[in-house]
Amino acid sequence: YELHRQIPLLLHRFAKQNLRHKYKEENLFFLGQIGRRIHSAGRTMAVVAILLTISLATMFVGLTMGAGYKANMKAYYPYDAGVAIDAPLEKSSMDSIVSFTEEHCGVEDSVSYYLYAVPEKSIEALSLSDYNHLREILGLSPVVMGNNEFLVHCDTWNYMDGIRQGLKQQPEITLDGRTLTIAVTPILTEPMEQYQMAGTKGYVLVLPDEAASQLVGEKIRLAMKLEDGGYPELKSDLKQFLNSGKWQPELQSGQQLPEKVTMGVTVRAWGVANSLTGFTAISFCGLYLSIIFIILSCS
């Protein structure tokens, strides 16, 4: 309040200090009128200024938070549709899911792939070919890597420093008697949804196909690119299909189901439709409050 109360007084005082400007034509009369107005209605002017400031601030917050909420959807839902099953199933088990999806909307591209368990490491792995197929679905350029190299993909920034430090301390890894060194570009960061689809911890190890094939595919994933992006109800349709007797998954030879099998389905159209509600609510609240404060300032 004091800030808005004193600013007009300071501006008036500075204007009066310029004597040439003060005594020029009718300026003396106007400066006197302004000074009397400031002293008689200074408090009202300060309150109006505060209300206008609050209204502009709420309008800015509403627009920026709403727009940011909408922009983050691309990172949360990079794939048109995805199915994540934490079980060592055969890749052929995912074919019926693709066929079911094609009955409801066109499937332009799809890839079934494993998240491999890395011995004695708290990180999962992707094969380079599957990784590049995911990049192709997302419209990203493929990655070229040597047969004795590896890289880490991490789209979660709070893990970046720890990964960089870990790669400096251990620039090589040994898998089944084979030593791999870090690639020229050791860390890639494009949004790939690394808490479910391309990893479950916010990061994943990318290995040459030959090295990855020696590991156990503990979790299976399916990513799909759909015509026109699909539709919101596809999420519930896929869940219903997975829980029905129509889907008959097959275990990998020599593998067993874990005690608890986690399944997840993501559909971008569903996420966008639901995020639109949040986006509209946040923006509307900010704009509504700003209008209220503008009305108060004018009354």
Predicted regions and their residues:
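Hydrophobic alpha-helical transmembrane segments of multi-pass inner-membrane transport and secretion
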Residues: 1, 40-65, 272-299
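Helix-boundary and loop/linker segments of multi-pass membrane transporters
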Residues: 22, 35-38, 272
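Hydrophobic alpha-helical transmembrane segments in integral membrane proteins
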Residues: 58-79
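Membrane-embedded translocation segments of transport machinery
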Residues: 36, 54, 63, 84-87, ...
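Membrane-interfacial segments
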Residues: 11, 15, 19, 66-73
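Juxtamembrane inter-helical linkers in multi-pass membrane proteins
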Residues: 14-33
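Nucleotide-cofactor and metal-assisted catalytic machinery
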Residues: 72-277
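Hydrophobic alpha-helical segments
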Residues: 1-15
